[in-house]
Amino acid sequence: MFIWEKDSINKEQEDAILEDNSVLLIACPGSGKTRTLTFKIAYELSRLKSDKEFVIAITYTNRASDEIKERVELLGVDTSQLWIGTIHSFCMEWILKPYHLYSERLKNGFKVINSFDSEKILTELCKPYKEEKITYYDCGILAKTDNFYLTCLDTKKHNSLQNILGEYFAILEKNRQIDFEQILFYAYEILKSKPVVANILSNLSLISFIFSS
């Protein structure tokens, strides 16, 4: 069991570390939030009773992932059952790769298109819309649980953008590709349509954290 020095954290930090239910940490920079999360991860790792259990730490950036993992290792805790990364990486590694066969769109295989190739396709599709001054930068989308939504604030462009993005998604589907935003969308779709997958993840005792600066 991971044990820390008595004076290394305060009572509130200790309560957060020992809490078995969900914890929301709100703290200003320099208040010890990172230390608390690091100790929490180390504590949960030391409590695992099976090699089928994992502690999952989800961060906003890869840099934060590296920092947290390094801090946990410096505490002398075995990190072989720690997975840490961004939400997109988590969805790829734990949902899409092992369970993509449950998705009608992905069941025949897929690859993730990089941002350069995505921009190249969208730039080409925008060319017929020069009079409307539509460019690649207008083609931003936000994936939500039910669909994709345009981020362009100029609503006059929305109809044309819907057409452009319709063509874009058709090209990706034809080539068995998905882009960055679709990683989250299809991961959620699998979890929603196949409760057995969500149940499997739950039974692995996955514990997740959102960490920012």
Where does each model-flagged region fall?
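Alpha-helix C-cap/termination motif
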Residues: 19, 47-48, 75
